[in-house]
C-alpha cells in the first residue's frame, strides 16, 4: 500500500494506492488507467463531455515544446523549485507534462493535474515518476496543507483551493505572458495588438498571497514553418485570428519572434499576520 497526498473528490478523505487502485476509507475507488494516470474528475463536477484543450492543440503544443523553444522558461522554474527546496509540488493545468516532468527531477513528489484527459494521457507516457491526475481546479485532488509549492503556468489560478492545499509557509509560482510576449506573431495575426497585462495577477492575489520575487525570461526564437504552425495551433490565437491572416502567417518560411515570460513567486500569507 502506498500513501501519497491525493484526495478523494467525493468525500475528501486521503486516498491510498492498493495494487493499481486508489481507495479511500469510505470505499470510493479509482483505477489507474493503462496509460498510467488516475481520473479524479467525477461526473458531478463536469460541465462538458471532453473538457479542456482539444487533442489538436495538445498535439501542437507537445510538438512545439519538444523543439526546446521554451526550455529557458522550463529551466527557470526548475531553478526556482531548487532554491525553495520544495519537496511536494502540485502543477495545476499540467497539460502534456513538459514543465511538470522537469519539475519532478528536483522534488520528492510531483503531482500534475489537468482537466483535459487527452493531455494527461500523453503526459503519463512522458514520466512515470509523476503522479498524473485528471481533475479540476475547482476541487484540487490533494489533501489540505500537503503541498510546499503549487505552480500554475499559463493556467487558471483557483485561489481558495490553492490556499487550502498549501502548507502554512507554502509558495505559489505563477507564469504568464509578459507584456510583449510573441508580439511579432500577434502583430501578424491581428490589426490591433493589445499588450499582455501580467500585473493583474498580483492585484488579484494580493489579499491571500504576498509577492516575494518576480522576473521576466526573454527567449528570442527563429521558427521554421512547422514550428510556427504548431505555435499558432497551440494557443487561443488559432481561433481568434481571421482565417486569411492565419493562412498568410503560416505560409512564411521563417519567423523571428521573442517569447517573453513573466514569473511571479508568491507566498501564502500567514493568517495570524492578517
List where the protein language model places each region.
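Conserved SAM-binding loop of SAM-dependent methyltransferases across substrates and taxa
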Residues: 96-107
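N-terminal auxiliary segments of SAM/dcSAM-dependent transferases
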Residues: 1-50
Amino acid at each position: 500500500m502506498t500513501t501519497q497526498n491525493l484526495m478523494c473528490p467525493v468525500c475528501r478523505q486521503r486516498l491510498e494506492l492498493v495494487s493499481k487502485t486508489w481507495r479511500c476509507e469510505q470505499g470510493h475507488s479509482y483505477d489507474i488507467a493503462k496509460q498510467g494516470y488516475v481520473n479524479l474528475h467525477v461526473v458531478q463536477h463536469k460541465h462538458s463531455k471532453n473538457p479542456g484543450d482539444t487533442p489538436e492543440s495538445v498535439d501542437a503544443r507537445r510538438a512545439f515544446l519538444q523543439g526546446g523553444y521554451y526550455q529557458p522558461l522550463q529551466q527557470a522554474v526548475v531553478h526556482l523549485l531548487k532554491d525553495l527546496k520544495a519537496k511536494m509540488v502540485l502543477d495545476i493545468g499540467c497539460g502534456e507534462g513538459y514543465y511538470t516532468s522537469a519539475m519532478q527531477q528536483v522534488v520528492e513528489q510531483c503531482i500534475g493535474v489537468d482537466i483535459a484527459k487527452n493531455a494527461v494521457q500523453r503526459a503519463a507516457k512522458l514520466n512515470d515518476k509523476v503522479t498524473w491526475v485528471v481533475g479540476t481546479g475547482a476541487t484540487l485532488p490533494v489533501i489540505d496543507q500537503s503541498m510546499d509549492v503549487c505552480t500554475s503556468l499559463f493556467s487558471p489560478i483557483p485561489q481558495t483551493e490553492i490556499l487550502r492545499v498549501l502548507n502554512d509557509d507554502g509558495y505559489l509560482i505563477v507564469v504568464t505572458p509578459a507584456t510583449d510576449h510573441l508580439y511579432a506573431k500577434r502583430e501578424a495575426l491581428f490589426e490591433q495588438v493589445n499588450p499582455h497585462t501580467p500585473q493583474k495577477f498580483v492585484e488579484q492575489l494580493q489579499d491571500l498571497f504576498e509577492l516575494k520575487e518576480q522576473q521576466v525570461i526573454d527567449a528570442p526564437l527563429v521558427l521554421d514553418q512547422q514550428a510556427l504552425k504548431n505555435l499558432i495551433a497551440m494557443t487561443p490565437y488559432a481561433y481568434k485570428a481571421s482565417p486569411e491572416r492565419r493562412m498568410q502567417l503560416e505560409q512564411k518560411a521563417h519567423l523571428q519572434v521573442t517569447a517573453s515570460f513573466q514569473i511571479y513567486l508568491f507566498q501564502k500569507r500567514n493568517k495570524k499576520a492578517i
